[in-house]
Amino acid sequence: MDLTPYRFLMTDLARASGEFIRPFFGRAGLVVDIKADATPVTQADRGAEELMRGLIAKKFPGHGILGEEFGGERTDAEFVWVLDPIDGTKSFITGVPLWGTLIALLHRGQPVLGCIHQPVLGQMMLGDGVTCTLNGRAVRCRSTTSVENATLLTSDPFNPSKYQNGAAFNALRQRAKLVRTWGDCYGYLLVAGGWADVMLDPIMNPWDIAALVPIIRGAGGVITDWRGGSAFPAESTVACSTPELHAAVIAALAP
């Protein structure tokens, strides 16, 4: 299957949404609403998703769309775009530049293309499950095989205790060489780019995960849920740089 036309649209979506969102970042008085799930949302989130939806509908009107802010349409289509206009809205509204835009393309329910776009940092990562590039340059995961030599990342250090086995996570964290909360999509970019080794999120939505799967796999890494099961659909994510490290992490997280 030739993904070239979809890859072109994906990069166009990333650039267009980034240009829309950037002026809102760091703006004084930015209005923040709280959604029913207690997560924040802004005009930038909503406007960027509307923009991307419009571009997709114009280019591929038969494709489906699933977005964080406006839900799904034609989600049973052969091709479905999955959109998270601002992954890391809490970072966005507090002036932390590690937020990004996640864009994925599903083919018959599985992610085949993914993009992480960091507009403030000027980084665009694209993966197709076989290859992965950062600003057009091929990247690969590191070769770390043990937890003791690993840099471990997570978005919120308190979430494992809320949603998974907190004691197991804390024990794993104590074993790691370095632990940081460079989280949300930026953490997965660091794993795929070869700067970190493990990225964990104990609670995820489809728009959080879909783009990450072809990116991590394209960079040579392994991505599953917290029990080593299917990466998508899933409600949690473990991404590791090598199969050996992934096996060790999954074993450590076991209840």
Model-found features: residue ranges?
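A short, compositionally biased
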Residues: R27-A28, W99, L126-T131, R217, ...
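Residue-level signal for inorganic ion chemistry
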Residues: I21, D45, I56, T89, ...
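N-terminal subdomain of lithium-sensitive/metallo-dependent phosphomonoesterases centered on the IMPase/IPPase/PAP
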Residues: M1-I86, V222, S230, E244-A251, ...
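Generic detector of well-ordered alpha-helical packing
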Residues: R46, E69, P85-G88, P119, ...
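DPxDG-like acidic metal-binding loop motif
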Residues: T75-V130, A150
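An extended, acidic
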Residues: R140-P255
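Short strand-turn-strand beta-turns centered on an Asx-Gly dipeptide
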Residues: R108, N135-A138
